[in-house]
Amino acid sequence: TAYYDAMIANWFNKKLKIEFPERKTIFGRKLQQLRYGENPHQQSSIYVNDYNDKHLKFDQIHGKELSYNNYNDMFASLEILNSLKKNSGTVIIKHANPCGVSENKVPLISFKNAYASDPISAFGGVIACNYKINKKIALEINKNFLEVILANGFDKDALNILKKKKNLRIIDISNFNLKNLSSIKTFDGSFLVQSKDNIVIDKKKLKCVTKLKPTKKELAEQTGRGRKSTTK
């Protein structure tokens, strides 16, 4: 009954566009019991909100069950991917931090450039692409060890190639939508809630207010908000 009442309350908040009500109920349905958390000694599960019809709209086509760290890296990759142009973006994540990001109207070049950014860190990482994976890209992917590949679809030849690696988790994100979600951080019975930082930056609308002007290379970077640290 409490679960049902909470769903009704959240539905009305959404309908009335009340993003931050005086009382907020956070609840979820267990989607999966995970083997362990960030470390082997930690327990972990993943939950989803039934009132949000856009939650985790992706399909796992192949591979082992997703782990806590897989999900964490996937979420980080999708947040950055959301800021890149459609059908051109590639993001590589390791330990929730980007180690390769690229945009190119030719998907194969986009993939190669992203991987070339830091091939050592990319080892055992997660790759997210907002384009469809074809045979040529699949052959490049299989040259490397990766935990997860997320993409906006896979053609038949690509799937046949990728499935040769039995442990590679293949995720179709064709129906995934990151917009209109909230970000929540918890600590000791309290939680911080904010709207998601999913604005796509329009360089034409940027205004420099300092004497030092950014270079074209600096403006091209889309990974700042995806980093856990800005130190080098």
Predicted segments with their positions:
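ATP-dependent carboxylate/acyl-activation modules
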Residues: Y3-K232
